[in-house]
From Swiss-Prot:
Gene symbol of the encoding locus: hemA
Function: Catalyzes the NADPH-dependent reduction of glutamyl-tRNA(Glu) to glutamate 1-semialdehyde (GSA).
Catalyses which reaction(s): (S)-4-amino-5-oxopentanoate + tRNA(Glu) + NADP(+) = L-glutamyl-tRNA(Glu) + NADPH + H(+)
Organism lineage string: Bacteria, Pseudomonadati, Pseudomonadota, Gammaproteobacteria, Pseudomonadales
Complexes and interactors: Homodimer.
Pathway(s) served: Porphyrin-containing compound metabolism; protoporphyrin-IX biosynthesis; 5-aminolevulinate from L-glutamyl-tRNA(Glu): step 1/2
Matching CDD domains: NAD_bind_Glutamyl_tRNA_reduct
Protein name: Glutamyl-tRNA reductase
PANTHER family: GLUTAMYL-TRNA REDUCTASE (PTHR43013:SF1)
Pfam family, one: GlutR_N
Any GO BP: protoporphyrinogen IX biosynthetic process from glutamate
Record note on domains: Possesses an unusual extended V-shaped dimeric structure with each monomer consisting of three distinct domains arranged along a curved 'spinal' alpha-helix. The N-terminal catalytic domain specifically recognizes the glutamate moiety of the substrate. The second domain is the NADPH-binding domain, and the third C-terminal domain is responsible for dimerization.
Length: 426
C-alpha cells in the first residue's frame, strides 16, 4: 500500500489558481467517489479551504500522475499549469505533512485552530462518501490525537492570530476609531463568526450579517447584537457600511463593481474597506479599481499576519517535535499491523499443515499402528512440512547471493539464542 498527500496551497499557488482548484461542499461526495473510481486510489479524502486544496489517498502503488490528471480534468485546468504549483508527499512525509496541517504549522497563520475543524469536516465527508477505509481512518485519528497534544502541551494556540484577526487588525489601521464604524459581513461560517467576534470585542458601532439563508444569519447575528439580512439586501446595506468582509462558499462573485459604485455615490465617496477572504472570490477584482475602495484578498493579509506571529515562533519548534513523534508512532503502528497480517497468514498455514498431519495420524491409528509410531510420524511429518518452504526459499536466496537472508533467518527463528554449542570446538 502507498499513502500520498497531494495538492496546492497559499505558498505554491496564487489566489487565482486556488479558487479554480477549490471544491464546493456540494461537490465533495461526488468528487471523492469519482476519484476512487477513476484513479488507483482505494481510499480518499479532500480538504478544500481558502488557502489549500489537498487530496489524501491510499493506493496499492504510488501513482500521483493519474491523480494530478484527474484533478486537472475535474477543474478544467491544463495539467502543466497544475503541475507547476502542486506538491506530492508520500509515505512518512505524507503523514508528517497531514499532521503539520492539522496543527496549523503549514498555515498562512501559524498555529491557527480553524484548520483542525476543517480537517475533521473533510474526514466526515469522506466517511459519508464511503471513501475512508482502515488506513485513512487510522491516520485521521492519529492526526487528531497529535493535534490535540500540540494544543495542550505547547503555546502554539495562544495570542489569537487568524485571517479573521488579521482582517480586523487591518481595518483598525484604516479606521482608527471602530466605535464610529459600521461593518457588513457576508457569509455566516466559522471565519465570519471569528470576524464578528473580533469586531464586537473592538466595540464596533454596528454589524450586519448577510447570508443566503436568513435563519443562519440570524443565529450568528444574535450572538453579537448584530442585524441579519439576506444576500439580496446587500446593495442597500453597502451605502451604510465602512467595512465589508466576505467569506462564502459561492462559486460566483456576490459583489460587483456596479453595486459598489452606486453605494459610493450614496456615501458621497466616503471610503469603504473591503476584505475578500473567500476562495473563489466573493468580490469582483474590478472593485479594487475604484478610487474610494480599499480591497484586500486573503493573500494581502500576509504582512499583518507576520507582525502577529512572533509570540508563536518559540512554540512552533516544540510543536514540530511532537509532530515528528506522532509521525514515527503512526509509522511504527503501520509496520506492526503489517507484521500482524503476515503472522496471521503464517498461523493459518501452520494450522492447515497440522490438520493434514493429524488426519494422517488418525488414519494410522485406525489401521492398527501403535501410538508410539503414530506420535513419532506425526512429529516428523509436521516438522518436515513446517521447515520445507523456509528451507527451499533460504537455499534459493543464498544461491542468488542474498547472504543477508541467513542473518535474517537466524534472527527470525532465534537460532542464536540458547543454541547447543559444539563441544568439539571448546
Amino acid at each position: 500500500m502507498a499513502f500520498i498527500a497531494l495538492g496546492i496551497n497559499h505558498k505554491t499557488a496564487s489566489v487565482e489558481v486556488r479558487e479554480r482548484v477549490a471544491f464546493t461542499p456540494e461537490q465533495l461526495v461526488e468528487a471523492l467517489q469519482q476519484l476512487c473510481r477513476l484513479t488507483p486510489s482505494r481510499e480518499a479524502a479532500i480538504l478544500s479551504t481558502c488557502n489549500r486544496s489537498e487530496l489524501y489517498l491510499e493506493q496499492d502503488q504510488l501513482s500521483s500522475d493519474e491523480v494530478l490528471k484527474w484533478l486537472a480534468d475535474y477543474h478544467r485546468l491544463s495539467l502543466d499549469e497544475l503541475r507547476a504549483c502542486a506538491y506530492v508527499h508520500s509515505e512518512q512525509d505524507a503523514v508528517r505533512h497531514m499532521m503539520r496541517v492539522a496543527c496549523g504549522l503549514d498555515s498562512m497563520v501559524l498555529g491557527e485552530p480553524q484548520i483542525l475543524g476543517q480537517l475533521k469536516s473533510a474526514y466526515a465527508v469522506a466517511r459519508e462518501a464511503g471513501t475512508v477505509g482502515p488506513l485513512l481512518g487510522r491516520l485521521f485519528q492519529a492526526t487528531f490525537s497529535t493535534a490535540k497534544t500540540v494544543r495542550t502541551d505547547t503555546a502554539i494556540g495562544e495570542n489569537p492570530v487568524s485571517v479573521a484577526f488579521a482582517a480586523v487588525s487591518l481595518a483598525k489601521q484604516i479606521f482608527a476609531d471602530l466605535h464610529r464604524s459600521q461593518a457588513l459581513l457576508i457569509g455566516a461560517g466559522e471565519t465570519i463568526s471569528l470576524v464578528a467576534r473580533h469586531l464586537h470585542d473592538q466595540g464596533i458601532k454596528r454589524i450586519v450579517v448577510a447570508n443566503r439563508t436568513l435563519e443562519r444569519a440570524s443565529q450568528l447575528a444574535e450572538q453579537f447584537g448584530a442585524h441579519a439580512v439576506l444576500l439580496s439586501d446587500i446593495p442597500d446595506e453597502l451605502a451604510h457600511s465602512d467595512i465589508v468582509i466576505s467569506s462564502t462558499a459561492s462559486q460566483l462573485p456576490i459583489l460587483g463593481k456596479g453595486a459598489v459604485e452606486s453605494a459610493l455615490k450614496k456615501r458621497k465617496h466616503k471610503p469603504i474597506f473591503m476584505v475578500d477572504i473567500a476562495v473563489p472570490r466573493d468580490i469582483e477584482p474590478q472593485v479594487g479599481e475604484l478610487d474610494d475602495v480599499y480591497l484586500y484578498t486573503v493573500d494581502d493579509l500576509h504582512e499583518v499576519i507576520e507582525e502577529n506571529l512572533k509570540s508563536r515562533q518559540g512554540a512552533a519548534q516544540a510543536a514540530e517535535e511532537l509532530v515528528a513523534a506522532g509521525t514515527e508512532d503512526f509509522m511504527q503502528r503501520l509496520r506492526e499491523l503489517a507484521a500482524v497480517d503476515v503472522l496471521k497468514a503464517y498461523r493459518q498455514q501452520a494450522e492447515r499443515l497440522r490438520d493434514e498431519e493429524l488426519a494422517k495420524a488418525q488414519r494410522m491409528l485406525v489401521n492398527g499402528a501403535s501410538a508410539e509410531d503414530v506420535l513419532a510420524q506425526l512429529a516428523r511429518g509436521l516438522t518436515n512440512k513446517l521447515l520445507h518452504a523456509p528451507s527451499v526459499r533460504m537455499k534459493k536466496l543464498t544461491a542468488e547471493g542474498r547472504i543477508d537472508a541467513l542473518s535474517l533467518a537466524q534472527e527470525l527463528f532465534a537460532l542464536d539464542e540458547g543454541a547447543p554449542q559444539d563441544k568439539g570446538l571448546q
